[in-house]
Amino acid sequence: NVLLVEREKFPRYHIGESLLPFTFEPLKRLGLIDRMRASAFIKKYSVQFVSTNGKASQPFYFNTRYNEDVAQTWQVLRSEFDQMLLENARNKGANVVENTEVLGLLRDGDKVTGVRVRQPDDTEAEHNASITLDCSGKESFTASRNRWRIRDPYLNKVAVWTYYKGAKRDEGIDEGATTVAFVPEKGWFWYIPQHNDMVSVGVVAEGNYLTRDGLKAPKDIFQREITHNKWIEEHLAAGKSTGDYYITNEYSFHSQYCGCEGLLLLGDAFCFLDPVFSSGLMLALKSGVLAADAVNDAIQSNDFCPSRFEDYATTLRDGIENMRKLVYAFYNPNFNFSDLTNKHPDLAGEVTDCLSGDVNKDYSRLWNAVLEFAPIPDNLPYGMPKVPEREMV
C-alpha cells in the first residue's frame, strides 16, 4: 500500500517547467507518454544560447543525437503536469491525500517509521510505513530539520522571474526551444515558451549584481535586466507581463545523507543544483525510478537497512556530479560552449548528452577538455545513507 501526502490542493503553481530528452523513459514507465503527446504542452526540440549582444547560437537539436521518441520533449505548465502525475498515482492504486501537512517523522530510535500529519479538518494523525520517501522538493523537509542541508560552495545565485503573454516565439520547431540568454557578470535569462500563448522568463545571477544601484523590488530588477540582452528585449516587446514577479535565492544545496533507516530522499529534497540546464525535473523523475526499484527490492526481501540503498545513492550522486561540473564550467568567465566545441568538435555529442540528461556515463574526455578552459569541482563527499552504528559493526 502506498500513501501519498500532499500539503496543497492540486492543481497548484510550481516553477521548473522544462523537460529534458532523458525524461522520456521515466514518463514511459509511468505510462504517461500518450497523455503527454495528447496534451497542449509545447513540444521542445532544442536548446540555444544567446550572447549579450543578442546573437543566437546554432541550436543544440536533440534529433542529431537521439531517435525520434527521445529527441522531442516538452515545455510544461507545472500545475497541469503535476496534476497529471498525481492522477496517475491515484489511478494506479496510491491513496492520495491533499491539503494534508506533514508535521514530523515518526521514529523508533534511529529508524523512521512513518509520518505525523495535520489533516484538512485540522486534526492530527499518524501513518506508519516500512519506508518513508521524502519528496518535499525545495522545502527539503528532512534535510532542513536534521541539519543535513549543505549549501553548494559556489552556486549561490538569485533568480527573479515572471510570465509574459503574447511574447514573440521563434518559428517552426524552434517555437518550443529553451533559450539561455546571457547578461553581464555571467548572469542569464531563461526563456521557456508555454501553451496558452504564455512564456516563462527569468533572470539568474549573483545577488550583488542584481541588487546593484540599490534595486530590491523583483519587478524593478527584472525590467532593468531586460535591457541588457537585445534578444530578450525584442522577444518580450510584443508581450505583456502577467504582473506577478517571483524571487528566490540560495537555492543550491546538497543533503549530507540520502536517508537513514526507514527513510529515503528524492529529487529536490535530496539536492538542487541550478536552473540553468533544467536538470531539476529530470533528476526528480530519475530519482523516482531509482528509488522505486530500490524500495521494491527492499520490500521483496523485507530488508530496509540503509546499506541496501547505497546503489541508489551512488547512481544519483554520480549523475548530479556530472551535471554539477557542467554548471560550474558554465559560470566560469573563461568558458563557453562554442570555444569548447570549436577546439574539440568530437565532443559536441558529449555536451549534448549531458545537457539532455544522460548523466550517468563516463565523461572523462569531456572534463579533461573543459579543464583547458576552466577548473572543475571535485565530487562532494555527500549523499550516502546514514548507517546506524549497530549496522557498521
Q: Model-found features: residue ranges?
A:
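FAD/FMN-dependent oxidoreductases across multiple families
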Residues: 209-294, 300, 304-311
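Helix-loop-beta segment of a Rossmann-like dinucleotide-binding subdomain
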Residues: 57-76, 114, 204-208
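Short beta-strand to alpha-helix junction loop
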Residues: 65-88, 211-217
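Predominantly flavin-linked oxidoreductase catalytic cores and closely associated redox partners
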Residues: 87-236
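A short, glycine/Asx- and small/polar-enriched loop/turn
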Residues: 45, 53, 106-113, 259-261
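C-terminal helical "tail/cap" subdomain of flavin- and related membrane-associated enzymes
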Residues: 293-393
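N-terminal FAD cofactor-binding segment of flavoenzymes
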Residues: 12-54
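Glycine-rich FAD pyrophosphate-binding loop
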Residues: 1-15
